[in-house]
């Protein structure tokens, strides 16, 4: 058997799905591809990709709907994506300090990428990015959205080729637990404040990213600097 044939056979016998990057999907995910590719486990990576691809509002809403919170360069359309990128990067720094295992990092990075996918409520066609409103319960509605993604996969693809169905339910729930804890002491449901160190890492990464302008500038935030640097 040639090495090429052996490689093909190994892929077919593997527990992981065979993944060939889709250029059209990659174009949609381009702003977050570096962060998505920080996930080592292919099943978790494909699951995360699939949910992000189906979260149309996620890509067009700002990170702050009132303009009172988050860095000024996140206040317009697409700001939620920039915030998410910063959350994952902050999580990586904290994960390095904790010397997390690869499997722990994958859960943290996936949760950070998905933590705000249902933050905005509005027109699902995304025809008017200004029409969205903030969902204060978004840490919990992510779970319902994931179920919807799984239902879509059942309708349109086989389980063997599905991005969301291939992942085991225990892993999904571990990721969703971290998502539910990302608001920390400001959680709308007290029962989901961070308890474990993974819970806390996701919360701290989100909190630090949302206060990045204060970390850099202090109380006197130089809005011009943030707006100019984002252009």
Where are these regions (language model features)?
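A glycine- and charged-residue-rich anion-binding loop/surface
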Residues: 217-231
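Polar low-complexity intrinsically disordered regions
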Residues: 1-14, 27, 151-164, 230-231
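Acidic/His-rich, divalent-metal-binding segments that scaffold phosphate/diphosphate chemistry
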Residues: 2-126
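Divalent metal-dependent catalytic cores for phosphoryl transfer on phosphate-bearing substrates
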Residues: 67-83, 89, 94-221
């Amino acid at each position: 058997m040639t090495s090429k044939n052996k490689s093909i056979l190994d892929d077919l016998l593997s527990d992981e799905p065979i993944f060939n990057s889709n250029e059209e999907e990659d174009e949609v995910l381009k702003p977050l591809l570096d962060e998505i590719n920080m996930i080592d486990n292919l099943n978790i990576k494909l699951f995360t990709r699939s949910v992000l691809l189906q979260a149309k509002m996620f890509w067009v809403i700002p990170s702050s709907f009132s303009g009172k919170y988050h860095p000024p360069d996140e206040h317009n359309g697409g700001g939620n994506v920039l915030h998410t990128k910063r959350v994952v990067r902050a999580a990586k720094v904290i994960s390095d300090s904790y010397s997390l295992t690869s499997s722990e990092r994958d859960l943290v990075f996936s949760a950070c990428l998905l933590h705000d996918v249902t933050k905005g409520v509005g027109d699902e066609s995304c025809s008017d990015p200004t029409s969205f409103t903030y969902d204060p319960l978004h840490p919990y509605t992510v779970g319902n959205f994931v179920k919807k993604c799984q239902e879509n996969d059942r309708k349109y693809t086989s389980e063997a080729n599905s991005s969301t169905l291939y992942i085991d339910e225990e892993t999904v729930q571990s990721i969703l637990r971290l998502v539910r804890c990302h608001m920390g002491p400001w959680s709308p449901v007290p029962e989901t404040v961070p308890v474990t160190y993974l819970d806390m890492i996701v919360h701290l990464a989100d909190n630090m990213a949302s206060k990045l302008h204060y970390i850099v500038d202090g109380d006197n935030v130089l809005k011009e600097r943030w707006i100019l640097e984002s252009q």
